[in-house]
Each structure stands twice: as C-alpha cells, then as structure tokens.
Amino acid sequence: MGRSLKKGPFCDEHLMKKIEKLNETGQKQVIKTWSRRSTIFPQFVGHTIAVYDGRKHVPVYITEDMVGHKLGEFAPTRTFRGHAGDDKKTKR
C-alpha cells in the first residue's frame, strides 16, 4: 500500500538541508545517511548518497530514473550466498 497523495512524499529534514546546502555551494561530496525511508527528490540528482544497509554505508549515485523511489531500495540489506549444491554429483 502506497502513501496517501494528500500527504505528499516524505524526506527527512536533515537530509534535505544537507542537499540544499550542497546545491547552493555547488559542491559534490558524499552524504552519509541512515534514512532509508526518504523519497528521492529531483534536487538529489547528481549527488552521491551513502545509504546505511545495517553493516556499512553503500554509496548510491542518484540519477533521474531514481526520482520518486526510496533510498533504501538501492542499498540491499541481505547478501545472497547461493543455494546449496546438488549432492547427486558428489555421490557418483
């Protein structure tokens, strides 16, 4: 279930302030954040945001295609190690 349209998209205030400050100065530096729940706005395009995945910060370069999605969608939290091997090959 998506967010109500009358509420509008959500973005943490501290993250938005950091982006606006960088846009004013024209700097491009990595922004560390723990806010996986924040929606990506058009102002974020061109910036690199390091999103926390539970272990480390994963650098995510924001493009136009990502606008409207959440930051957490681009920093996976689980590492897939693969399924168990087939025992039939080893028995022969």
From Swiss-Prot:
GO biological process terms, semicolon-separated: ribosomal small subunit assembly; translation
Listed name of the protein: Small ribosomal subunit protein uS19
Family per similarity comment: Belongs to the universal ribosomal protein uS19 family.
Function: Protein S19 forms a complex with S13 that binds strongly to the 16S ribosomal RNA.
GO cellular component term, pick one: small ribosomal subunit
Top-level taxon of the source organism: Bacteria
Keyword list, A-Z: Ribonucleoprotein, Ribosomal protein, RNA-binding, rRNA-binding
GO-annotated molecular function: rRNA binding; structural constituent of ribosome
Organism expressing this protein natively: Geobacillus sp. (strain WCH70)
HAMAP family in the cross-refs: Ribosomal_uS19
